[in-house]
Amino acid sequence: KFSCKRSDLVNTVGRDLVETVENPFKGKKVPKTVMINNWIDENEIYPLDESNEKVLAFKKKYGLDDKFVIMYSGNIGLYYDLENLIKVVEQIKPGTKTADGREVVFAFVGAGSVLDKVVLYVKEHHMDNVTFIPYQDKADLIYSLNAGDVHWCVNAKGIKGVSCPSKYYGLASAARPVIGVLESGSEIRCIIED
């Protein structure tokens, strides 16, 4: 509130974040607020065919070739409730196959403050269908995003209006299907529903 009062303009990346900025003022001298969505350079991230040589090389490097890949790519941090998400992932037992015979696997690409907890949980529960992959160079992000058959886009409960998972814009630009676990009224959920 202190910073907002002294600002000429407050920029947010979501409608729910505009509410977060304006609500503490209760209608009194609300700072001028604008929303500008995050974006992605469509010349850097775009859909690639599943037979793309570099997508196949990425899959092979991380043992994802010929598998159905459910991917989480980005910050493995506090705002994403990954400690609960991994418990959901645990319900899909190793060896589970899709209708076309591909094994279902989960890939977590990135790093962050809860990575060690999630890795430990996976080891302790013998979740052999989960793999962890380090952050990719920006130039290689197109291949890793296109390697996922479907992607998680999640936020922890109570984070609406505080955090906006900008990973969605890359997933949309790569035309990847998304499993959204997002609070009602949160910016990315609104975009998905629109």
Label each PLM-derived region with a short phrase:
Residues K32, L64-I70, E103-V105:
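Charged active-site motifs of nucleotide-sugar-dependent glycosyltransferases
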Residues L64-Y80, I86-E90:
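Conserved donor-binding/catalytic core segment of Leloir-type glycosyltransferases
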Residues N38, V69-G77, A111, P134-Y135:
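Conserved donor-binding loops in enzymes that form glycosidic bonds
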Residues D16, I36-W39:
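Carbohydrate-associated surface elements
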Residues Y46-G63:
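A short helix/loop element that forms part of the nucleotide-sugar donor recognition site in Leloir-type
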Residues P94-G110, L115-D140:
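Nucleotide-activated donor-binding/catalytic signature segment of Leloir-type glycosyltransferases, i.e.
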Residues K1-V10:
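Membrane-proximal helix-turn-helix segments that form the acceptor-binding/catalytic region
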Residues Y80, V130, D137-S144, H151-A172, ...:
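Nucleotide-sugar-dependent
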